[in-house]
């Protein structure tokens, strides 16, 4: 029986390779930044990191992290409720809550844990969760852990969301929660949060938003998609990460009203049974929020880069998804083509990743490019030139 198990895994791996669905992990030997070094020693320009503000290797963050270790040590060796809560953890939680316009916040090891520990803690079998079809895997998995009745609506489809809300209310749900990404990360599309909040008000539902791909750079002050959509104060729960725009290390959080956060501290299993966030990450994250609040220079640079890339790629004839975001997917359709395109781009000094099933639906393979404030206009033009050459070679564009 054990032999059959390993044989099955071997066959599955071989099938994934044969179908072009096997994900290779490429090695980076430098710090994460716009210009990186890979295993063969070559220098490439990175267009696939979540390093939106270009802060992953910023000297001010590195110095803040070092200072955090000097003052508070390397690790906590404890969960929060035993002996793993330092003053800096509370300071970061308060700063996150204030920045997001919420009453309180709670830190997790990752946003995956924040979402994984949210739904089953707050909702039960008498309740209902209505989830966008393109929500992140962490929301999907978190909802699966919950006993609440589950509904799903087509991506950003307000008519279908309203139909699901009616179903849930007619079925007698005690509490109804709408769960959505703030930005759908495979498409670079911002959720229609005004429509969601309007329907939530109409049907007396709660709204939860995972804003991992927005906080720090989306909205006038970088507060996220709820600021961009002018619904601050109308979203009940915001989850997010410290591992993308806010420094790119690790850590997640949930921000909400105080009673929600306090109940999560009492019952959320990933919070109760995971080590506290490391002091270096906490200190650097506080510094990041200070930098974001200090001015719009990095955000302005990011959006200028996104506009340049989208305009030049569209002019070259590529089909692009999304809008108004630093995620700009280049649609290719075929998984094998997406992988070959990515390999050829790396030879040209452009570092990207092909995305394909099961990460995206079959037939919708793509290269998801991500702009950074750290990119220069010259680097963006170089990337577009490489895309254009290879696109013509592979028959993607004329």
Swiss-Prot record:
UniProt pathway: Amino-acid degradation; L-threonine degradation via oxydo-reductase pathway; glycine from L-threonine: step 2/2
Modified residues (N6-(pyridoxal phosphate)lysine): 244
Catalytic activity: glycine + acetyl-CoA = (2S)-2-amino-3-oxobutanoate + CoA
EC code: 2.3.1.29
SUPFAM superfamilies from the UniProt entry: PLP-dependent transferases
One Pfam family of this chain: Aminotran_1_2
Gene3D superfamilies for this protein: Aspartate Aminotransferase, domain 1, Type I PLP-dependent aspartate aminotransferase-like (Major domain)
Keywords: Acyltransferase, Pyridoxal phosphate, Transferase
Residues that, per the record, bind substrate: 136, 368
GO molecular function, one term: glycine C-acetyltransferase activity
InterPro entries the record matches: 2am3keto_CoA_ligase, Aminotrans_II_pyridoxalP_BS, Aminotransferase_I/II_large, AON_synthase_class-II, PyrdxlP-dep_Trfase, PyrdxlP-dep_Trfase_major, PyrdxlP-dep_Trfase_small
Record GO biological process: biosynthetic process; L-threonine catabolic process to glycine
GO cellular component: cytosol
Co-factor binding comment: Binds 1 pyridoxal phosphate per subunit.
Binding site for pyridoxal 5'-phosphate: 111-112, 185, 210-213, 241-244, 274-275
Recorded coiled-coil stretches: none
Cofactor: pyridoxal 5'-phosphate
Family in the record: Belongs to the class-II pyridoxal-phosphate-dependent aminotransferase family.
Subunit-level organization: Homodimer.
Role, per record: Catalyzes the cleavage of 2-amino-3-ketobutyrate to glycine and acetyl-CoA.
Protein name: 2-amino-3-ketobutyrate coenzyme A ligase
